[in-house]
């Protein structure tokens, strides 16, 4: 899935994200780099409003995956591995 495909569905994706407490949604990984293949997942980097839990994050990933028809991995900046965080934050593109 290419980034421009996600952008065309931006409002729908952000509506789902907001319903699960996401206040910022970015795309990273192969989709952001333009190297995604037909079976690639979509990686989302989100910031959650205060009081949201891991359950919200998991539910968001499932709903985004169902909406896109492919696996959606969702993580937060604080959950990024320190050795990968700088690269991921640099390539992340706002939805």
Region roles according to the model:
Residues 1-24, 32-38, 49-95:
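Catalytic core of pol beta-like nucleotidyltransferases
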């Amino acid at each position: 899935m290419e980034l421009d495909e996600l952008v065309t569905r931006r409002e729908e994706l952000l509506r789902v994200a907001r319903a699960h407490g996401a206040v910022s949604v970015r795309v990273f990984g192969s989709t952001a780099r333009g190297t995604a293949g037909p079976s690639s997942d979509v990686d989302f980097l989100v910031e959650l409003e205060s009081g949201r839990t891991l359950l919200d994050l998991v539910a968001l990933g499932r709903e985004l995956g169902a909406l896109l028809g492919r696996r959606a991995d969702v993580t937060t900046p604080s959950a990024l591995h320190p050795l990968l965080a700088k690269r991921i934050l640099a390539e992340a593109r706002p939805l």
